[in-house]
Protein backbone atom coordinates (compact mmCIF):
# COMPACT_ATOMS: atom_id res chain seq x y z
CA UNK A 1 0.00 0.00 0.00
CA UNK A 2 2.82 2.43 0.85
CA UNK A 3 4.47 1.89 -2.54
CA UNK A 4 1.12 2.43 -4.28
CA UNK A 5 0.52 5.69 -2.38
CA UNK A 6 4.07 6.93 -3.08
CA UNK A 7 3.52 6.73 -6.85
CA UNK A 8 2.38 10.21 -8.01
CA UNK A 9 0.31 8.68 -10.83
CA UNK A 10 -1.96 7.01 -8.30
CA UNK A 11 -3.02 10.30 -6.73
CA UNK A 12 -5.31 10.83 -9.71
CA UNK A 13 -7.32 7.70 -8.90
CA UNK A 14 -7.36 7.94 -5.11
CA UNK A 15 -9.51 9.97 -2.72
CA UNK A 16 -8.12 10.57 0.74
CA UNK A 17 -10.19 8.90 3.43
CA UNK A 18 -12.11 6.62 1.06
CA UNK A 19 -11.34 2.90 1.23
CA UNK A 20 -12.92 2.40 -2.20
CA UNK A 21 -9.92 4.15 -3.78
CA UNK A 22 -7.82 2.22 -4.40
CA UNK A 23 -10.43 -0.50 -4.75
CA UNK A 24 -8.18 -3.16 -3.19
CA UNK A 25 -7.71 -1.34 0.13
CA UNK A 26 -10.34 -3.50 1.90
CA UNK A 27 -8.23 -6.62 1.23
CA UNK A 28 -5.79 -5.36 3.85
CA UNK A 29 -8.50 -5.82 6.49
CA UNK A 30 -9.07 -9.49 5.68
CA UNK A 31 -7.61 -12.11 7.98
CA UNK A 32 -6.32 -15.15 6.11
CA UNK A 33 -3.77 -17.94 6.24
CA UNK A 34 -2.99 -17.63 2.50
CA UNK A 35 -5.58 -20.34 1.89
CA UNK A 36 -8.89 -19.07 3.32
CA UNK A 37 -10.40 -16.10 5.11
CA UNK A 38 -10.72 -16.76 8.81
CA UNK A 39 -10.87 -15.53 12.37
CA UNK A 40 -7.39 -15.45 13.93
CA UNK A 41 -6.71 -17.13 17.27
CA UNK A 42 -5.84 -13.71 18.76
CA UNK A 43 -9.32 -12.40 17.92
CA UNK A 44 -10.90 -15.55 19.34
CA UNK A 45 -8.92 -15.11 22.57
CA UNK A 46 -10.10 -11.49 22.81
CA UNK A 47 -13.69 -12.68 22.34
CA UNK A 48 -13.18 -15.29 25.10
CA UNK A 49 -11.78 -12.62 27.41
CA UNK A 50 -14.69 -10.26 26.77
CA UNK A 51 -17.21 -13.07 27.26
CA UNK A 52 -15.35 -14.39 30.33
CA UNK A 53 -15.51 -10.94 31.92
CA UNK A 54 -19.30 -11.25 31.93
CA UNK A 55 -19.45 -14.71 33.54
CA UNK A 56 -19.08 -14.71 37.35
CA UNK A 57 -16.87 -17.34 38.99
CA UNK A 58 -18.95 -17.44 42.14
CA UNK A 59 -15.94 -16.23 44.16
CA UNK A 60 -17.52 -13.85 46.66
CA UNK A 61 -14.57 -13.71 49.07
CA UNK A 62 -13.47 -10.44 47.50
CA UNK A 63 -10.05 -11.81 46.58
CA UNK A 64 -9.04 -12.01 42.97
CA UNK A 65 -11.09 -11.69 39.83
CA UNK A 66 -14.76 -12.50 40.33
CA UNK A 67 -15.26 -13.30 36.65
CA UNK A 68 -13.68 -15.71 34.17
CA UNK A 69 -11.87 -12.85 32.38
CA UNK A 70 -8.33 -13.85 33.45
CA UNK A 71 -9.02 -17.57 33.59
CA UNK A 72 -10.27 -17.46 30.00
CA UNK A 73 -6.79 -16.35 28.95
CA UNK A 74 -4.70 -18.68 31.09
CA UNK A 75 -7.09 -21.64 31.08
CA UNK A 76 -8.19 -21.88 27.43
CA UNK A 77 -6.03 -22.40 24.34
CA UNK A 78 -7.31 -21.97 20.79
CA UNK A 79 -5.69 -24.89 18.97
CA UNK A 80 -5.64 -23.50 15.43
CA UNK A 81 -3.99 -20.38 13.97
CA UNK A 82 -7.41 -19.37 12.64
CA UNK A 83 -10.91 -20.73 12.29
CA UNK A 84 -11.88 -20.60 8.61
CA UNK A 85 -15.02 -18.65 7.76
CA UNK A 86 -17.67 -20.55 5.82
CA UNK A 87 -20.45 -18.83 3.92
CA UNK A 88 -23.43 -20.59 2.28
CA UNK A 89 -21.09 -20.94 -0.72
CA UNK A 90 -18.32 -22.61 1.29
CA UNK A 91 -14.98 -21.46 2.61
CA UNK A 92 -13.70 -18.20 1.12
CA UNK A 93 -10.49 -18.91 -0.81
CA UNK A 94 -7.80 -16.24 -0.45
CA UNK A 95 -6.56 -16.94 -4.00
CA UNK A 96 -9.84 -15.61 -5.45
CA UNK A 97 -9.51 -12.40 -3.45
CA UNK A 98 -5.78 -11.92 -3.95
CA UNK A 99 -6.43 -11.66 -7.71
CA UNK A 100 -8.42 -8.48 -7.02
CA UNK A 101 -5.27 -6.64 -5.89
CA UNK A 102 -4.80 -5.40 -9.46
CA UNK A 103 -8.49 -4.66 -10.18
CA UNK A 104 -9.15 -0.88 -10.03
CA UNK A 105 -12.96 -1.08 -10.36
CA UNK A 106 -14.61 -1.27 -6.92
CA UNK A 107 -17.85 -2.61 -8.46
CA UNK A 108 -15.94 -5.70 -9.60
CA UNK A 109 -14.71 -6.20 -6.04
CA UNK A 110 -18.33 -6.09 -4.86
CA UNK A 111 -19.34 -8.64 -7.52
CA UNK A 112 -16.50 -10.98 -6.53
CA UNK A 113 -17.47 -10.78 -2.86
CA UNK A 114 -21.11 -11.59 -3.68
CA UNK A 115 -20.00 -14.60 -5.74
CA UNK A 116 -18.08 -15.89 -2.70
CA UNK A 117 -21.02 -15.49 -0.31
CA UNK A 118 -20.39 -12.16 1.42
CA UNK A 119 -20.68 -8.43 0.75
CA UNK A 120 -18.52 -5.35 1.05
CA UNK A 121 -19.93 -3.08 3.72
CA UNK A 122 -19.34 0.63 3.09
CA UNK A 123 -19.71 2.84 6.16
CA UNK A 124 -18.74 6.34 7.20
CA UNK A 125 -16.58 6.17 10.32
CA UNK A 126 -14.88 8.80 12.45
CA UNK A 127 -11.09 8.71 12.33
CA UNK A 128 -9.73 11.40 14.62
CA UNK A 129 -11.80 14.51 13.92
CA UNK A 130 -12.87 13.62 10.38
CA UNK A 131 -15.18 11.08 8.80
CA UNK A 132 -13.74 8.53 6.40
CA UNK A 133 -15.43 5.95 4.20
CA UNK A 134 -14.47 2.50 5.40
CA UNK A 135 -14.98 -0.81 3.57
CA UNK A 136 -14.99 -4.14 5.38
CA UNK A 137 -16.10 -7.63 4.37
CA UNK A 138 -19.51 -8.44 5.84
CA UNK A 139 -20.75 -11.98 6.36
CA UNK A 140 -24.51 -12.04 6.91
CA UNK A 141 -24.58 -15.84 7.07
CA UNK A 142 -21.40 -17.48 8.29
CA UNK A 143 -19.97 -20.27 10.36
CA UNK A 144 -16.58 -21.04 11.83
CA UNK A 145 -15.44 -24.09 13.70
CA UNK A 146 -12.35 -25.08 15.58
CA UNK A 147 -11.11 -26.58 18.79
CA UNK A 148 -9.98 -25.28 22.14
CA UNK A 149 -8.09 -26.99 24.92
CA UNK A 150 -9.33 -26.20 28.42
CA UNK A 151 -6.54 -26.27 31.02
CA UNK A 152 -8.45 -24.82 33.99
CA UNK A 153 -10.66 -27.16 36.06
CA UNK A 154 -13.04 -24.30 36.90
CA UNK A 155 -13.88 -23.95 33.20
CA UNK A 156 -16.35 -26.78 32.80
CA UNK A 157 -18.31 -27.47 29.62
CA UNK A 158 -21.20 -25.45 31.10
CA UNK A 159 -18.91 -22.50 31.92
CA UNK A 160 -17.32 -22.58 28.45
CA UNK A 161 -20.78 -22.67 26.90
CA UNK A 162 -21.82 -19.66 29.01
CA UNK A 163 -18.69 -17.71 28.05
CA UNK A 164 -19.23 -18.37 24.34
CA UNK A 165 -22.99 -17.76 24.40
CA UNK A 166 -22.56 -14.45 26.22
CA UNK A 167 -19.68 -13.46 23.93
CA UNK A 168 -21.83 -14.28 20.89
CA UNK A 169 -24.77 -12.26 22.15
CA UNK A 170 -23.04 -9.28 23.80
CA UNK A 171 -19.48 -9.05 22.43
CA UNK A 172 -19.25 -10.42 18.88
CA UNK A 173 -16.32 -10.63 16.49
CA UNK A 174 -14.91 -8.18 13.92
CA UNK A 175 -15.42 -4.47 13.36
CA UNK A 176 -18.50 -2.64 14.63
CA UNK A 177 -19.31 -5.47 17.04
CA UNK A 178 -21.25 -4.73 20.25
CA UNK A 179 -18.05 -4.62 22.35
CA UNK A 180 -16.06 -2.32 20.01
CA UNK A 181 -14.53 0.31 22.28
CA UNK A 182 -14.97 3.40 20.08
CA UNK A 183 -17.76 2.58 17.66
CA UNK A 184 -19.92 -0.34 18.76
CA UNK A 185 -22.45 -1.83 16.40
CA UNK A 186 -24.66 -4.83 15.96
CA UNK A 187 -22.35 -6.91 13.77
CA UNK A 188 -20.35 -10.04 14.51
CA UNK A 189 -22.87 -11.72 16.78
CA UNK A 190 -23.03 -15.50 16.75
CA UNK A 191 -24.55 -18.57 18.35
CA UNK A 192 -22.53 -21.54 19.53
CA UNK A 193 -22.60 -25.34 19.54
CA UNK A 194 -20.03 -27.15 21.68
CA UNK A 195 -19.01 -30.77 21.34
CA UNK A 196 -16.67 -32.29 23.90
CA UNK A 197 -14.08 -34.45 22.13
CA UNK A 198 -11.82 -35.63 24.90
Write out the residue ranges for each language-model feature.
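RNA-interacting cores
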Residues: 1-198
Amino acid sequence: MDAWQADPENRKVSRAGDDRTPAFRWLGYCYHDRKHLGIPADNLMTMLREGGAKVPTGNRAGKGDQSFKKLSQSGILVNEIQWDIETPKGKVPWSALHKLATEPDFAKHEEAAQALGFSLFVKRARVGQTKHTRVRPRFDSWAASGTVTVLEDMITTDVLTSILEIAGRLCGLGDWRPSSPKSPGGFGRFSVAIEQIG
